[in-house]
Amino acid sequence: MKLILVLLCLISTLFVVKGGLSPTEQQIIVSYHNKWRSSPIGPTPSTTIPALKWNATIAAALQSSLDKCDGKFSTMSQYGTNSEWQSWWTPNTYFNLNATLDNIQKGASFYDWNAKGCNSSANYNCQLWTYAVWSKSTSYGCAKTICPDKSEVSCSYYPAGGFKGVLPYTPKTTTPAPTTPAPTTPKPTTPAPTTPKPTTPAPTTPKPTTPAPTTPKPTTPAPTTPKPTTPAPTTPAPTSTLTVDWTSYQTPIRDQGQCGSCWAFASSAALESRYLIKYGTAQKSTLQLSNQNAVNCIASGCNGGWSGNYFNFFKTPGIAYEKDDPYKAVTGTSCITTSSVARFKYTNYGYTEKTKAALLAELKKGPVTIAVYVDSAFQNYKSGIYNSATKYTGINHLVLLVGYDQATDAYKIKNSWGSWWGESGYMRITASNDNLAIFAYNSYYPTF
């Protein structure tokens, strides 16, 4: 079994700089695991969960696998003997072992003891926590490596655990209540479980139910985004009645790193591309909005968000540029809505109805943020038109829809996992079905 922590990520082949856990880091990992098993978050175990034994053989095999920097899980996981997770931080200097382990611990609150699996409505991964407290696992090993552009840490547990439908340990009570209520608005931030969700009908509510946060009034007038002195020619109408491709109006592919900020990246990418469509592509390589500004200002930050909240929050104050509030891939405490330097402004935002026809009609005007469900097959996408073998009804990730090809009936999306993923950071998805639950919720777009 295998799952990637917080974000579903692929890692390209790179040359290793150095690797290995320090004695202090190993002790931190051991201490966390001892605490998780001796005092588990959740119902009291019927019997004490035995402490895991550090297995040097597992650790060495895992180290050898990680040092390849190819993003693949070890053969122990591939053969199904071990449960395994990986977490990476980019750039290297952002590596934070305690934050990684804290994120795993947070997953305990999202385990549904009645359903015997992660709370499907919470859209927060809890499976890594079940690996760590699986009562039948007896030993484990962990490893760390530093590649040129990222740091990776991984743990592998023997024998494998974390199976959906099986409790990680036997509680004293037989039917405990779920530890966390399901939120009313999806938070597409965390890795998808490998087990498909039940095929229940998609919600019929026309827009997300969580109210958008109140926009703070700036204390001083914020400078507006400078517009080109002469408007650029508009894009020629597509030759087909439905086919459209806005790829040539995209800023470079970004990488959200070890932070559940896909919602911010998709929303800022929509702003950037729609600006270029209206005013020309002179700033195509330089226009970059601050995703950190969004992560700092909107509730939950690296733990999730929604495009509607993003566009509503920054409609009045505007959003900072990357150079003024650079991305750190962590939830900060300083929400900046005013400054002496220019902020990027837009007029308003809207959303589409939950139909293919409505989505394609809006796509003719420019890219639209869409929510999708990501599973292991999605994360391993390389090229071609992806067709999910499983029909999902929930979502856990936000991307930017940039095109549609009528001949192949396929969408084209821009992701935020770096240019080494998929087709240089992009992906094509069949539009012949809604297996990824695109129409479970409304899709959003900004206007100028």
Swiss-Prot record:
Span list, region Disordered? 171-242
Record localization:
Secreted
Give start-end of the signal peptide: 1-19
Would I find Transmembrane among this entry's keywords? no
Which regions form coiled coils? Answer: none
* EC number of the protein: 3.4.22.-
Null mutant phenotype reads: Suppression of cell fusion.
Biological process terms in GO annotation: conjugation with cellular fusion; immune response; positive regulation of apoptotic signaling pathway; proteolysis involved in protein catabolic process; sexual reproduction
**Catalytic residues in the record:** 262, 397, 415
Keywords (alphabetical) are: Glycoprotein, Hydrolase, Protease, Secreted, Signal, Thiol protease
What name goes with this protein?
Gamete and mating-type specific protein A
Cite the SCP domain residue spans from the record.
Answer: 30-157
Give the protein's biological function.
Thiol protease that seems to be involved in the sexual development.
> Does the entry feature the keyword Cytoplasm, yes or no?
no
**Known glycosylation sites:** 55, 98, 119
Q: Which domain of life is it from?
A: Eukaryota
GO MF terms held by the record? cysteine-type endopeptidase activity; cysteine-type peptidase activity
An annotated GO cellular component: external side of plasma membrane
